[in-house]
A protein has these predicted regions:
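Conserved nucleotide-binding/hydrolysis micro-motifs of P-loop NTPases
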Residues: 7-9, 19-20, 55-56, 64-68, ...
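N-terminal "pre-motor" subdomain/linker immediately upstream of P-loop NTPase catalytic cores
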Residues: 1-120, 125
Length: 288
């Protein structure tokens, strides 16, 4: 068993002996708790477990068949309290373009894209953006895979590729539902991006995500998917790339020697900022 904390995997050896003897039983029990098929061990399965109703914590569970007949189980912790996080609490400020983001979010139409690797907090940012504009008189629809959090006052739709109801099909239906705002969980194919661009150009505010390393790459990706450059420039209002940066422990971090100004500039600091910054590194302690 391993836990991923702040992007780093840690072994939990105290469970090793128990899981070695009872792994299949634990896997079956988890399937029962999340209403998965306990007899299916050939195909991947997904499920959800309400973990702590009072605190609003749920578990998203994925079962993956592996060689030898066993299954790999991954559980993701979802905290509904994260929905109430304000944009300022996500580390966004005027220096990081918060004013530009708010301007794009409050526009009557256009496309706002959030990019970054898996697990970089794109969904949390999108939900925070929706919370910012979720007011009476605004019709908001979302197409997600899966629907991770229930949002009050927002129409959320679970896409089902297995029955032919993908993001593209959901978007076509949305355009007949008279929405002001549309959220697409992810732009994956040409069909989806074509409808999303059409929506952004016809009086709708569209939010979505892309898996690219930086903001400029998102424009290239849209063009590679078949959208003419003149439509991209007309439809896209803003692209924001984000990462989750680990914080140093305030109890054990110390100034890290040997970091040059050139290295800090390569990380995105200006020359003036790099000259004033004193990089620190945590050593690890009981507090962290």
């Amino acid at each position: 068993m391993r836990f991923r904390v702040d992007g780093v995997l840690y072994n939990q050896n105290r469970f090793s002996d128990f899981l070695e003897d009872h792994y299949n039983a634990v896997s079956t029990r988890l399937k029962i708790m999340c209403n998965a098929n306990i007899s299916e061990r050939r195909l991947p399965q997904d499920g959800a477990i309400p973990f702590d109703v009072e605190k609003g914590i749920d578990l998203r569970v994925n079962f993956l068949p592996t060689h030898g007949g066993s299954e790999r189980v991954v559980m993701r912790i979802l905290n509904k309290k994260g929905l109430s996080v304000k944009l300022e609490q996500l580390g966004l400020d005027e220096k990081n373009g918060l004013d530009k983001l708010l301007s794009a979010v409050n526009a009557p139409q256009g496309m706002v894209l959030i990019t970054g690797p898996t697990g970089s907090g794109k969904t949390t940012t999108l939900y925070s953006l929706l919370s910012t504009i979720n007011k009476e008189g605004i019709n908001i629809l979302t197409a997600e895979d899966p629907v991770e959090y229930a949002l009050e006052g927002i129409g959320q739709v679970q896409v089902r590729d297995d029955i032919g109801f993908g993001f593209g099909s959901a978007l076509r239906a949305f355009l007949r539902q008279d929405p002001e705002v549309i959220l697409i969980g992810e732009i994956r194919d040409k069909d989806t991006v074509e409808i999303a661009v059409k929506a952004a150009l016809t009086g709708h505010l569209v939010f979505s995500t892309l898996h690219t390393n930086d903001s400029p790459s998102s424009i290239t990706r849209l063009i590679d998917m078949g959208i003419p450059p003149y439509l991209v420039s007309s439809a896209v209002s803003l692209v924001m790339a984000q990462r989750l940066a680990r914080k140093n422990c305030s109890h054990c971090s110390k100034v890290q020697e040997g970091v040059t100004v050139e290295q800090l500039v390569d990380l995105g600091f200006s020359t003036e900022e790099a000259s004033a910054v004193k990089p620190q590194k945590g050593k690890g302690c009981g507090k962290c």
